[in-house]
Amino acid sequence: MSTKSYRSILPNNVPSTGKVSFARGNPIITVTLGRQDAMLDLSSLRLSGNLDVWSNAAGTEHPQGAGPARAAELQGSHKLGIYSCIDQLVFRHAETKQVIEHIRHYGRFMSSYMPVMAGMQDVAGHLSKSALIMPNYQAYRDNVIRSTRSSVFCVSLPAGLTLGVDKLPLDKVPLEIEIHLAPDSQFFYSSDATTTNISNAFYELSGLELTCEVETGVKSPDKGVLDFNSI
């Protein structure tokens, strides 16, 4: 008899503070789903955590738009939301390190994927909460960039593997997921083409975890291939 359950996995390389950022030397997040007698539902993979935006190098001030120190011109992509943080996405065998799929320029892919898969109703509704994708730049600036509280997110990881393969036998293919963070200069832009007040701005992620659904008690195939369209 098969049983479905949910797993929550913490990244392997998060420092003791629980916070990661490109600016502070943590450009790569690695999560490992080790070898186990279970079938992984790839469509259920979700990355969740908190996003903070800081206007100074010390990470103590939010860009609230009140004076030079507040970086009033600081902006980000309202069309990508939290996906702006991801520069590359890699899936590989956790033991042999054989690469299954490697997507470079992930933000460019998502900028083409999201308009096709989501409408304005989605953006104004659940995507504004789950992926921090907003209807316009002002909503993103006011609710994410200038927010004095952490912005919570929980997103899927669209890729050829997650969209094209239903179940993955973890007893034969333990999975390692590697997320390369985007540089701050790629995540932010200036609304008036001047960068004097935003040169020290950076984004920071915390409380990161990967959740997924696995099914146990199911016989995994003795042979076969992973058939999917790589992106």
Which residue stretches match the model-derived regions?
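Short, low-complexity Pro/Thr/Gly
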Residues: 1-231
